[in-house]
A protein has these predicted regions:
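Short, Gly/Pro- and small/polar-rich lid/capping loops
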Residues: 1-42
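Active-site- and interface-proximal helix/loop "cap" or "latch" segments in soluble metabolic
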Residues: 13, 35-202
Length: 202
């Protein structure tokens, strides 16, 4: 259902975050995230006036992953920044993401490696969207999310486990209507120790 009707108001700032996933010709996947900040007016920054229409920030983060969600390459780019010539020193630090796994405590580890002066606060924010973007990209493509289940980042090839997505949000709880209607085989099941539980929610 939509949000309630707002009181009269005026747009002062727009931040947009988007993520896209690409299957590559070499069998790997690229997960890209972009953050932009705009103001609907000229803005006086410490470095000068930023005219209306030009972004305050336009930041990019790309990780290349295999089908087990291991990060095999990473790069960042600061296209528009409030401190030109200075903010661009941060992107090389994001090579530190190589070797992490998007499903296993990625947000915690990315924050440990890149928080504060180790990186750019906004690029580090973008790290948070990568795990679920990858999971959404893999669902129904790399992983089977239908009733038979048995696939996901920790699957063993035997359909003894429910579909990856079950038990990970309120709508998909095992005793809920969605599972009863669409995944009856798993209705009422319990899975106390979900692989990776919490790792995509940190």
């Amino acid at each position: 259902m939509p949000l309630s009707e707002p009181v009269p108001r005026q747009l002062r700032h727009r931040r947009a975050i988007r993520a896209e996933a690409y299957e590559r010709g070499d069998g790997l996947w690229d997960i890209e995230a972009c953050l932009t900040d705009h103001k609907p007016r000229d803005v006086a920054l410490a470095s000068g006036i930023r005219p209306q229409g030009l972004p305050i920030h336009e930041l990019w983060l790309r990780v290349t992953i295999d089908r087990e969600l291991n990060v095999v390459d990473a790069e960042a780019s600061s296209e528009w920044v409030p401190y030109p010539g200075q903010c661009q020193s941060a992107p090389p630090a994001y090579r530190a993401l190589i070797g992490l796994n998007l499903f296993r405590h990625f947000r915690r580890d990315a924050n440990r490696l890149l928080a504060g002066v180790a990186g750019c606060s906004h690029l580090t924010e973008l790290c948070a969207v990568l795990p679920t973007a990858a999971i959404q990209a893999f669902a129904g493509d790399v992983w089977n999310v239908r009733e038979e289940g048995g696939e996901g980042p920790d699957h063993d090839g035997v359909h003894a486990e429910p579909p990856f997505q079950l038990g990970r949000c309120r709508a998909l709880r095992f005793d809920g209507e969605v599972v009863r209607q669409y995944y009856p085989r798993w209705y009422g099941a319990s899975r106390p120790d979900l692989p990776g539980e919490g790792s995509t929610k940190e």
